[in-house]
Amino acid sequence: MPDMKLFAGNATPELAQRIANRLYTSLGDAAVGRFSDGEVSVQINENVRGGDIFIIQSTCAPTNDNLMELVVMVDALRRASAGRITAVIPYFGYARQDRRVRSARVPITAKVVADFLSSVGVDRVLTVDLHAEQIQGFFDVPVDNVFGSPILLEDMLQLNLDNPIVVSPDIGGVVRARAIAKLLNDTDMAIIDKRRPRANVSQVMHIIGDVAGRDCVLVDDMIDTGGTLCKAAEALKERGAKRVFAYATHPIFSGNAANNLRNSVIDEVVVCDTIPLTDEIKALPNVRTLTLSGMLAEAIRRISNEESISAMFEH
């Protein structure tokens, strides 16, 4: 069996080290930096010939820099005769640009990135909670899309929730919320229906379901600026919700996210470590992080040993 080796770019160094620790190994020796003009510089400083290589790199902000690091590392390893290269992308950037809405003149950038990764020699992709699962079909190589929900669910069960109800922040997240509700002792579910009555009128949030006197668990795949999430929490509290917890896999936290969360009525925001948090976000008392290192380490081990990934999520 080929030697398994882990390498990491600069996007998620702490997560990469945690994964390596879980696998009782060390990260491979690679110098990933910049030339004086800002171009990505990569040098692999150990033998990888015939190896089973895993590159751990989220394509989070700065998205283009991290994506280029990943593809240049793949090229360097391919030219060094690596046997198989798996791109471990905990957070897959550009995933929200996955279709042309109403035939608008816009790119399908998720497909562009998929083609880019395939063209440089990626043999397989391992990612977490793709924004749209059909993005797997954009790739010409196998894609394992694993789920953060078991880690989030395990934490939810420790909260001592009082008469809980799972809330989807929009119509598109109903399938995710329903799955969590079923696993959370088959609890009830509510949906927030956001709509604008007419142009230039503020968005109105209609809550489908009874949340009065209950602990609400908002679930989503990602939190970006947090603006919509915070407004959803306000709407739930106005409808009599007792406490509001927000769970998401990917903590993008861009723009005014820190201020939004600091001033929100959300009791706690729980996210995973697919994207590093800024110091400002880390300082917020209502934000907590869970690690996916154990799950990703197990997925990497299974891929390397040609074992089933789906078996990890069978209940």
UniProtKB/Swiss-Prot annotation:
Domain of life: Bacteria
Residues given in the record as Mg(2+) 1 binding sites: 131
Species of provenance: Salmonella typhimurium (strain LT2 / SGSC1412 / ATCC 700720)
Signal sequence coordinates: none
Subcellular location: Cytoplasm
Keyword Lipid metabolism: no
Activity dependence on pH, as recorded: Optimum pH is 8.1-8.6.
Active-site residue list: 194
Single biological process term from Gene Ontology: ribonucleoside monophosphate biosynthetic process
Record GO cellular component, one term: cytoplasm
Cofactors, names only: Mg(2+)
Residues reported to bind D-ribose 5-phosphate: 196, 220, 224-228
Name of protein: Ribose-phosphate pyrophosphokinase
Subunit structure: Homohexamer.
The reaction(s) this protein catalyses: D-ribose 5-phosphate + ATP = 5-phospho-alpha-D-ribose 1-diphosphate + AMP + H(+)
